[in-house]
Amino acid sequence: MWFIVFLLLWPQTPPELDFNAYRAHVEPLLLEKRPGHARCVVCHSTGTAFRLQPLPKGQAAYSEEASRKNFDMVKKFVRAGHPDESRLLLMPLAHEAGGTEFHPGGKHWETRDDPEWKTLADWVNGGR
């Protein structure tokens, strides 16, 4: 019995956030145009604490170097293993679904069942 309690109380090591999964699944969402909203990179490449690299004119994707810089920035807004505590997922999530009250770029997801939200949550949980 004590062993089970010990295991339950033992701190869990958070999953490692994977760069390749970020580049394949997360970064495209930051570049995607959504109806009624600007692409994340439009606002987040200037004047915000969550600062992404500007996308070079005429480019549809980032270089590996720029992706690594973005990955390092995005990790600051994520609590690995805890999507429900990660600002990357909470800021653009509707308040009624557990998101923050305000996101200057609007609310991108109405529920946690949104496929984009699930993609991000999977990555935060260590998905590859």
Give the location of each predicted region:
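Sec-dependent signal peptide recognition
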Residues: 1-7
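Aromatic- and Gly/Pro-enriched helix-to-coil junctions and flexible linker segments
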Residues: 9-128
